[in-house]
Amino acid sequence: MPRYKVFAAIDLGSTEITMKIAEVSKKNGISVLDTVKYDLSIGKESYAVGKISYNLVDKICNCFEEYLRIMKSYGVDEYVCYATTAVREASNSEYIIDQINIRTGIKVTIISNEEERFLHNKAFALNNSYFDDIIEAGAVLVDVASGSVQVSHYEQSKLQFSQNLPMGSLRVLENLSTVKNSTTSFSSVLEDFIKAGINNYKNVFYKNPNYKYFVIMGNQVRYITVSYTHLRAH
């Protein structure tokens, strides 16, 4: 009997398709062997027109066919493939996953926002030993994605509430795409739009301003970090 298994996890996201391949064993836990990313702005089309075109589905299938070859080279035993906001909100989502399955054999599971954020928080907890300490002291976890932002409030180790804001980076840009071409101060419009969304959230949900910890995470954080570093440098 082998002492380990090789798993693959595919994330069909709003801006990229990511695959991680990992070796899992009782002795060593999870060891990531490879991470592969393919940039594909599915959300840009989904958020703008409410559906995903056949041309884009074709690109997804081509990517998955390459991922299958990579999985075979690693001897992957099992895989999961999750689709998130961009596919979930597309009016032709069932057609998309059917086409992927017919062409590649890959079974795609569309997960809910709640399932997606639960997995993100669980991954954060597993990778950060201080998680239990900060949620005991009081913490706000902000999960920034392309389609939305999830804000979760913890006190005394319990989740008090969690709210989803449709203010993901890509969705906001798509919502304001017509304004962008008709103004010379788009950055100000963008700032006002985001502030309005945050203020609405604070007025309705934000009851305790004394949380000790504020944690920001998600696949869009790296862009925020780069932007902040650029501003500091200038």
Regions picked out by a protein language model, each given a short descriptive name:
Residues 176-217, 224-225:
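ATP/pyrophosphate-binding catalytic subdomain of soluble kinases
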Residues 34-126:
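N-terminal phosphate-binding loop and flanking beta/alpha elements of the actin-like ATPase fold
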Residues 15-54, 157-186:
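Short glycine-rich, Thr/Ser-proximal phosphate-binding strand/loop in the N-terminal lobe
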Residues 229-234:
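Conserved small/polar residues in nucleotide/adenosyl-binding loops
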Residues 2-29, 136-161:
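Gly/Thr-rich phosphate-binding beta-strand-loop-beta motif of the actin/hexokinase/Hsp70
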Residues 2-3, 113-140:
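Conserved phosphate-binding catalytic cores of ATP/NTP-utilizing and phosphoryl-transfer enzymes
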Residues 65-78, 128-132, 200-212:
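Phosphate/pyrophosphate-binding loops at sites that engage ATP/ADP/AMP, CoA/4′-phosphopantetheine
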Residues 76-85, 210-220:
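Short glycine-rich phosphate-binding loop at a beta-alpha junction
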